[in-house]
Amino acid sequence: MKLAMGIYDAPEKQAQPVFYLEPLKNNVAVFGGPMSGKTTFIKTLLVRLHQREQIPNESIYIIDFSGNMGEYSKLPNVCACFDNSNEENVKRVFKAVEAQLAKNVRLLKGQSFVGCEFKNQKTDIRHIIFIIENFNSFLADERYDSYQEVLMKLCRDGLSKGLTVVFTANDCSGISRWLPNFRQKIAFDMPKEGYMEIFGSKVGDLMKLPGRGYLNVNESVYEFQAFLPFVKEEHASLSKIMKQFKGKTNANRLVAFDEELSIQNYGAYSASSKSYEDDSLVLGDDSVIIGLDYYEHQPVAINFDESRSLAIYGKRQFGKTNVLRLIRNEIKKKHGKEYRFLISG
């Protein structure tokens, strides 16, 4: 997989070759000050991943500490895009990434992911891209301290199993120990001492342009100009990509529970995107769906043919009666005059 992301100056060749990013082979670190082009680079990456003629099994997870992803978070292969306002959502992203990685390991059976890349398009092996926008904020937030060692392991061991980690950062504060796991480094406009820490060599003065920076091609450092996501008007071009995938659903997409879950809005949060009634038909008359799994959005159901009794515990005003009422209504709807005893109190 090679993605055209910009051009770089190669004076020894007297040329300006196209820079192709190879996310299957490298984790990617993107640095730069405010308005330097970091987020635009990530948007271009997302677009390039969706512009290939054959889209492989791909799952993209984004923790967006900058809050700038906007409409790009709705691209079809984006499975999650959460900000840092709710720790539970960040936990869900990590859990989803780890679960898919474990599935890859099981299916690869000791092979390297790159060595068997998409030979069978029907396989459940997926390429996972895990993006953290504003890595400095992630590292500085005490709520996420426990995730740092998990992330370090993902950075160190993930590539051979189909996981690529990408982050953006304003500077190198607290990031030095992470850099050995990121072979591809890109640095837009920032203080000169930052380039030395990132690349280990001095660089010249940059032209002050958004998207202008430095990157490494193998071990050499070159001046670089990043491409924009689209040549023409951004919104129209993004809409065109969305239309190409119209009718296709992403069964792995995670959404935030930003309202109370009900039978009416069930389909908006279910992994299957099916209505409550449709999922109930699949499970049969003896089962009652009482909600969705918080992490995978799969139906949580009680089979009353197998479970002859049920105890519901919880604090006052935390939903016990609502669950009981739902069960009663569904039993009445499915079984009519058949009696089941429900005791509340």
Q: Positions of the model-derived regions?
A:
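Amphipathic alpha-helical surface "interface" segments used
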Residues: F113-I128, E259-A268
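P-loop NTPase catalytic phosphate-binding loop
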Residues: K2-G110, K119-K185, D189-P191, Y276-G345
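Phosphate-binding and hydrolysis-coupling loops of NTP-dependent motor/remodeling domains
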Residues: M1-G6, I175-I289, V300
